[in-house]
């Protein structure tokens, strides 16, 4: 189907070209005939004018006999005859127009300086120039276009789009290539060599550390000689060492408690001690149970007290501490046994506090808890 359409279009184009050639030949023939007619009319007018002049010269008596008014003579002298108004340059221009190839381009070659005369010759030429039949032919020829083919138009548009896209892609590639930094071969080689040297040093250090680990760990913990087995064996060995350390610390604590029990004196002389001595010993035991530790850091005081349990002891101690210009920031209470209590105070010294050293603070706290 496409081949048939193309053949039909080519045949139509061929017919149109033949019609144009025939029209052009007819126009040339018409131009030649009209130019010949114009030439004949000009020659007739010239011959007619010469005959009139000869008649006037041959018959002077008639001119003398005829009485012409003076005003008519002046009008004849002022108004030239239409036959004498014709100029040779315009005629030569008309003859030169016969050599033109296209009849519709005559107006471009007319002389613009020649004035318009009311002569039959000029009217005929103007009629020829503005012939409506010729203008219709010219418009038909100019308006005749090739038949519309949507496939060809679509292909041409696709080609244009592809060309535009290709040009844009090439420009982008050129820009990208320009933006890339150009490196010399020497710089690339130097970078490669430095990278190789750094990698060698890293591997060497890793091998040294792995060898040191392998020498410390027993061989029973290393199943293979690779890096993963060495690291895994080291982790297992460290865990076992931690367990052994915890067990040894527990054994040490148990031995210390047994030694303290053996050192308690078993003396029967205590049975014969008098009641006075027993009272004094009880007081010493009570005082020995009271333990006070004070640490001073600038305006902050950490106070730890261990004493026997008494009713209302904590409230009374807090009131007395406030009287000594201490503010309680934090308090922690623990009771290791039913008869003993330990207090942990976090205090802040105010500006009006007279106690500055740790010894003074411990002495004041001892008085509070002994009373």
UniProtKB/Swiss-Prot annotation:
InterPro entries to which the protein is assigned, alphabetical: bHLH_dom (IPR011598), FAMA/SPEECHLESS/MUTE-like (IPR044283), HLH_DNA-bd_sf (IPR036638)
Subcellular location, record wording: Nucleus
Stretches with biased composition (Basic and acidic residues): 250-264
SMART domains according to UniProt: HLH (SM00353)
Keywords: DNA-binding, Nucleus, Transcription, Transcription regulation
Sequence ranges of Polar residues compositional bias: 270-279
Disordered, as annotated region: 149-190, 250-285
Expression by tissue: Expressed constitutively in roots, leaves, stems, and flowers.
GO biological process, one term: cold acclimation
Keyword set includes DNA damage: no
Pfam families in the record: HLH
Biased segments, Basic residues type: 172-181
GO CC annotation: nucleus
Entries under PANTHER family matching the protein: TRANSCRIPTION FACTOR BHLH67-LIKE ISOFORM X2, TRANSCRIPTION FACTOR FAMA
Complex and partners: Homodimer.
Official protein name in the record: Transcription factor bHLH70
Source organism of the structure: Arabidopsis thaliana (Mouse-ear cress)
């Amino acid at each position: 189907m496409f081949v048939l359409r193309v053949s039909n279009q080519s045949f139509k184009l061929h017919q149109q070209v033949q019609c144009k050639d025939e029209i052009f030949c007819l126009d040339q023939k018409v131009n030649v005939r009209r130019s010949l007619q114009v030439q004949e009319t000009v020659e007739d007018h010239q011959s007619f004018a010469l005959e009139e002049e000869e008649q006037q010269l041959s018959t002077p008596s008639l001119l003398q006999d005829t009485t012409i008014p003076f005003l008519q003579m002046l009008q004849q002298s002022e108004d030239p005859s239409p036959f004498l108004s014709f100029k040779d340059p315009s005629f030569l221009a008309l003859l030169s127009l016969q050599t033109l190839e296209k009849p519709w381009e005559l107006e471009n070659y007319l002389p613009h300086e020649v004035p318009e005369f009311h002569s039959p010759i000029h009217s005929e030429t103007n009629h020829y120039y503005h012939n409506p039949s010729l203008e219709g032919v010219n418009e038909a020829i100019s308006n005749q276009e090739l038949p519309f083919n949507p496939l060809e138009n679509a292909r041409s548009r696709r080609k244009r789009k592809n060309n535009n896209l290709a040009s844009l892609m090439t420009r982008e590639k050129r820009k990208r290539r320009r933006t890339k930094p150009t490196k010399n071969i020497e710089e690339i080689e130097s970078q490669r060599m430095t990278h190789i040297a750094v990698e060698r040093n890293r591997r060497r250090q890793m091998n040294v550390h792995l060898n040191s680990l392998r020498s410390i760990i027993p061989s029973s913990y290393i199943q293979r000689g690779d890096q993963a087995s060495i690291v895994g064996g080291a982790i297992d060995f460290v865990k076992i060492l931690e367990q052994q350390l915890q067990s040894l610390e527990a054994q040490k604590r148990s031995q210390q408690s047994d030694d303290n029990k053996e050192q308690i004196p078993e003396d029967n002389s205590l049975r014969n001690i008098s009641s006075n001595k027993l009272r004094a010993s009880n007081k010493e035991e009570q005082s020995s149970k009271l333990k006070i530790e004070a640490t001073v850091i600038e305006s902050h005081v950490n106070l730890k007290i261990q004493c026997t349990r008494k009713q209302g002891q904590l409230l009374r101690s807090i009131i007395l501490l406030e009287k000594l210009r201490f503010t309680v920031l934090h308090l922690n209470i623990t009771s290791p046994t039913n008869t003993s209590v330990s207090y942990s105070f976090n205090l802040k010294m105010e500006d009006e506090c007279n106690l500055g050293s740790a010894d003074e603070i411990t002495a004041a706290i001892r008085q509070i808890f002994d009373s």
